[in-house]
């Protein structure tokens, strides 16, 4: 179907939803690299005007990647919640935006329709929204998940403690874990990106995390962010696996470039569930995503990178995850050039993920060769905290010495907690109080005398 829009003496034509969505996207380097971005600001506005008039039902009839060639498209269509969609089925994309911003779109009503919203609908409406719109609507979305604690409750923000080390040195990792715990981080998980893919090393790191969590009785979960096939093998060997991790993307071809498909993810989830390691819930999948991953694998099918990203959330949604996060600026300036593009993408990702019913966090980050700095990350972190982000990263000094990129620190998390009054997962907050690390108001006690005790228990 061809979509047309007249502006002045010019008629703009867009050949199908795929092109319409791409041309309506706010500027970013990845879409320019792919050759699918709008040629001018006027063409972008024309695309948005045409997109606003598209009925939501059209997204169920016109796939941006064909049903026959892509299992993610099949997942989206086959799992669509028609009863949930009924409440918004009469709306256009523009009307959907108006409804989302209205008082009628409450946390309860958004939860009822979330499974009826396809990723392309979410991506489409986001392209009509200013940053403040993305923040306001995401704030209304209530999404919780649970394993050893409860994540995503109103007025709370969690932190993944990220103690990476360039040589997977257990002492260095343990020191970073101690640093994070004393600063109140780690309720989302303690998650290590390993430098090695050797199963023996991964197993050692899993046992390290399990020992620390067990000895200190921390109500949290450990994760080593290795490939899902490695995790499956280690589960078979009896390793103490809490969360099953995998990077995912929004097309079948992109996921195959990662070495995964939906069947493998189902197998991994079932294996994780068989261990029964959760205490307050059984959400155990952890997914990471990021705009540009499909394009980097030449697996984007000329779909814009933000719509591809939203489609990755359909994959995540199928597996009831504990955690999902966009690593928003990690892929580099070829896909998100500067601070402005990273900030916009982070807000889009959080909005789309929450709208689709996911416990979405964001790694507020950039690479050292991007036109961005820590002030840009302060801005994005503050906006996401205002939007109710589920979790962020806690990296010592915000500088990941293994992955060589800049993220957010334990102190950055304390900043937004103070600014917005955000608490941690309730079970984790209670543990901090019992351990003497926080006072009765859940503020860190700053008791330096506890350092030797905790250090000795960590390395026991």
Where are these regions (language model features)?
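Anaerobic metallocofactor- and corrinoid-dependent redox/one-carbon enzyme cores
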Residues: 1-176, 182, 187-460
């Amino acid at each position: 179907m061809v979509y047309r829009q007249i502006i002045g003496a010019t008629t703009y034509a867009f050949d199908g939803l795929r092109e319409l969505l791409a041309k309506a996207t706010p500027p970013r380097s990845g879409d320019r690299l792919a050759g699918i971005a709008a040629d001018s600001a006027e063409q972008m506005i024309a695309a948005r005007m045409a997109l606003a008039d598209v009925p939501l039902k059209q997204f169920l009839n016109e796939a941006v990647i064909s049903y026959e060639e892509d299992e993610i498209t099949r997942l989206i269509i086959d799992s669509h919640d028609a009863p949930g969609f009924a409440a918004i089925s009469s709306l256009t994309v523009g009307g959907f935006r108006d409804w989302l911003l209205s008082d009628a779109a409450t946390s309860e009503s958004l939860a009822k329709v979330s499974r009826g919203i396809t990723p392309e609908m979410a991506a489409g409406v986001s392209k009509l929204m200013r940053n403040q719109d993305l923040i306001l609507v995401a704030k209304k979305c209530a999404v919780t998940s649970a394993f050893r604690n409860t994540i995503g409750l109103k007025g709370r923000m969690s932190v993944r403690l990220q103690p990476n080390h360039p040589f997977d040195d257990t002492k260095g990792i343990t020191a970073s874990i101690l640093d994070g715990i004393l600063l109140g981080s780690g309720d989302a998980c303690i998650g290590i990106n390993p430098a090695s893919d050797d199963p023996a090393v991964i197993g050692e790191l899993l046992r390290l995390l399990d020992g620390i969590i067990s000895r200190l009785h921390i109500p949290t979960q450990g994760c080593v962010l290795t490939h899902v096939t490695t995790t499956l093998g280690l589960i078979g060997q009896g390793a103490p696996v809490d969360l099953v991790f995998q990077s995912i993307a929004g097309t079948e071809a992109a996921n195959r470039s990662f070495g995964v498909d939906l069947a493998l993810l189902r197998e991994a989830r079932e294996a994780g569930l068989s261990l029964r390691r959760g205490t307050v819930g059984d959400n155990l999948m952890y997914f990471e995503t990021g705009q540009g991953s499909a394009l980097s694998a030449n697996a984007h099918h000329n779909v814009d990178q933000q719509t591809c990203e939203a489609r990755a959330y359909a994959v995540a949604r199928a597996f009831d995850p504990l955690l999902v996060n966009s690593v928003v600026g990690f892929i580099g300036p070829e896909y998100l050039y500067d601070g402005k593009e990273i900030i916009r993408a982070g807000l889009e990702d959080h909005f789309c993920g929450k709208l689709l019913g996911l416990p979405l966090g964001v790694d507020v980050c950039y690479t050292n060769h991007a036109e961005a700095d820590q002030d840009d990350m302060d801005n994005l972190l503050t906006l996401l905290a205002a939007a109710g982000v589920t979790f962020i990263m806690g990296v010592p000094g915000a500088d990941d010495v293994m992955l060589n990129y800049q993220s957010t620190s334990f102190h950055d998390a304390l900043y937004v907690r103070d600014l917005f009054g955000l608490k941690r997962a309730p079970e984790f907050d209670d543990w901090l109080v019992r351990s003497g690390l926080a006072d009765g108001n859940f503020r860190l006690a700053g008791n330096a005398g506890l350092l030797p005790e905790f250090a000795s228990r960590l390395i026991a």
